[in-house]
Amino acid sequence: MKATGIVRRVDDLGRIVIPKEIRRTLKIREGDPLEIYTEKDGGVIFRKYSPMGDLQDFAAQICESIGANTGHVAAVSDRDCIIALSGAPKRELLDKPNSQALEKLMESRKNYRYTPGGTRLRATEGSDKYHLGVAAPILCQGDLMGCVMLLLGENDPALAEADQRLAQTVAGFLGKQMES
């Protein structure tokens, strides 16, 4: 682990201020949950917590089912990266950071469907091979948790409204699973 050389004091309420540079680098937003671990030698470790991580295996099974039934690449992301994928090589997309366009789309909490001639939104940073066909935000008690996506290749035709409804249904289901 690399030391950053920043020292912070704990205030009367037990709070520690994490510097803006570190929050920006690690993409820690206001209100994001952090896990706190302690080491035997007295060290304290803070790690970003992804509630979607608890559903990673389940999301992978759903992606396999959607991918098999639609013939398209199916993916589920949390707010930071793709956590489940089916229909594409995992090394290309899995655990890759979400693109800024996808983050902006998720923040709007709106469903998305690509239309021919429209702007192609990439799912991940640095990958031009796939773009969003449909996307539906995963909401849990009003909080944004991630996104369900069907991805298209360069020459794939646009997806139908039924595919968009499928993504919406799966996103709603995953949101309900997180509530329980």
Label the model's feature ranges.
Residues 1, 28, 65-68, 126-130:
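Short loop/turn motifs at secondary-structure junctions and domain boundaries
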Residues 7-85:
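Intrinsically disordered, low-complexity terminal regulatory regions
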Residues 56-65, 98, 102-103, 149-180:
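Juxtadomain coupling helices with adjacent low-complexity linkers
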Residues 63-125:
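Structured interaction and signal-relay segments at domain junctions
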Residues 85, 146-147:
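Short glycine-/small-residue motifs
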Residues 132-139:
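A short, aliphatic-rich beta-strand micro-motif
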